[in-house]
Curated annotation (Swiss-Prot):
Residues bound to [4Fe-4S] cluster: 500, 509
Family: Belongs to the PsaA/PsaB family.
Name recorded for this polypeptide: Photosystem I P700 chlorophyll a apoprotein A1
SUPFAM superfamilies xrefs: Photosystem I subunits PsaA/PsaB
Assembly: The PsaA/B heterodimer binds the P700 chlorophyll special pair and subsequent electron acceptors. PSI consists of a core antenna complex that captures photons, and an electron transfer chain that converts photonic excitation into a charge separation. The eukaryotic PSI reaction center is composed of at least 11 subunits.
GO biological process, one term: photosynthesis
Membrane topology: Multi-pass membrane protein
Binding residues annotated for chlorophyll a', in chain numbering: 602
Top EC class, one word: oxidoreductase
Amino acid sequence: MPPGRPEVYQERFDIVQPHCSSEHTISLNTDFSKAAFGSATGLVAKAASQTTTAIWNLHADAHDFSNSSYLSKQVFAANLAHIGVAFIWLSGMHFHGAYFSNYLDWLQDPSIAPTAQQVSNIANQSVLNPIRVTSGFFNLWLAEGITSTYQLKVIAAFGLIASALCFLGSYFHMHSSTSFTRVLNTKLTSLSTHHLVGLLGLGSLAWAGHLIHISLPVNILMNAGVAVPSPHSLLSSKAVATIVEQLSFSALTSSDGYVWQPLVYSAMHHFALALVLIVGSVLGPLSTASNPLMSFTVGSSWHLVLGVQLFVTGTASVLYAQMSNAYPVYPYLLTDHPTVVSLFVHHMWIGGFFLVGAFAHLSIGLVRDTLPQSFSVVLTQRDIILGHLTWVVAFLGVHSFGLYVHNDTMQALGRPDDMFSDNAISLLPVFARWSTLTLNSTGSAVSVLGVELSTADFMVTHIHAFTIHTTVLILVKGFLYARSSRLVNDKYKLDFRYPCDGPGRGGTCQISPWDHVFLGLFWMYNSISVVIFHFFWEYQSNLASIKASAGGSIRALASDFELNSINTNGWLRNFLWSGAAQVIQSYGSPLAAYGLTFPASHFVWALSLMFLFSGRGYWQELIESVLWAHHKLYVVPHIQPRALSITSGRAVGFTHYLLGGIGSTWSFFLARIVATAG
């Protein structure tokens, strides 16, 4: 085994094929004792430094940390550097909000659109003015109690100071040779406790205190039309008591959908969460001694712990995406429909990537770190687990798409009464009667809270179940078979990723844990795309179906989603084709930026197909031809190009595929919602 790596216990899951005798068995040389993981050595390093292979090694070996005492220093330094970059980004957002946005105007009249970044009219760029802000920062700033640009500037300055401190700390932890850093950060369990207590626990407590003493009084005063004093004057409990006694919290429960009472519940939630994290991490189930994650060698594996944390964070991101519309916390968010859509879509994508990353790092941990014997119980039952999951996927796929096939057939035959719909064969979800659509109107602004479930929701929800279970099947299979399989029983010796060797060794293509992550990313893209398509179509069609009655109240008629999403043609015609009208026809209008992003993202997506549909031979021929032409012209590059490997080609392919798809969807959604409900 490589130096510094723990011995891997003997695999007890190797399955020997009975028809393979020892004399016909191919001997595989998987001894990596002379190689150093994470860096090439000897002639390989010398050759790679003069070729483009060195660039790919930087990406491919990004997670190849050695199990030395410097591991914690590397991880901690990278963590601080990442936080420093985040502080710079936050500082920039507050700086531009202070100097180049209409935040103060928005505070006076929250019904106007939040905008920023006035574009200079050099070559008719003023057509883009004003650039719409859909990040939700205006709502967040008001929830924080920020009422002036001076406060934004102060926060921007402190953000730069915090980023500088993080970068200095990163440099210190990475390059300091003192034993202080090594002793402080060697224990992974102590670092996890630090995150629970210091960051999450105390951070939640500080945020709860800020909400109670600053944010809630400021929002009460603003909603009551009273001049807001300096935040420093609100720090005393007497001032807060006076405000609450005179104005009460009823000012935060107005029915216009602007300022919602959940801001009060948010303070309670973070206070309770702080108590659970601080007390529980020391005495309770979150402590090192009783934490099931730390009870075996998971606690000594950075990758396994990171996988669990990514899984929890990704799940929390998906849950917040649902709450951004179902139970919004921030003031005036319900009437800012483009921001609601952006928050939902953004957090769904973040959750999807984090969940796939969780399985990737869990697989790396299983391959490279010592496994406890207790976990072998799960690995010995993996065939049964995957067998059941496969049948679930097959059942969901056949029946969920069968509903749409039935409706397509009945529509083609001219038999609408035999279709699954609210007006014919109704398939309402079980809890549909408890899910209601709440509509409120103040002036020209309309707020939408919740959703009414229909047969269309029942059908598309089963598509969600199918795509999500398929993604889980792929990722769980790659995770459980990361160490060994029927075909290759020594995967743990080959590491997390290894090249496709073709049929020579019995076929080792698409069986490494990396290949499962690669395939899982595409199915994650499918899953999230169907979810955000469902949400966006139903959300914007509910807005379009709202009609005002003679008495001033509002009601919702049958929406386009309910009527047309029950068959395949409706998704293609009413959603994609008709819904793309705004982004396609946006040239010469303030939506032109989305119109430019839309075809550009399509190009990036289409470029990915060149990498995904090609093999290594194509790139080898291409590079050889390019090199031949350079040598004929006596223009020889100093860094010699090398053909893309299969792994590298797939990495380039799925990166462009996902970025292009996300950019296309984002521009399509925003152009539509800004034009129709912005």
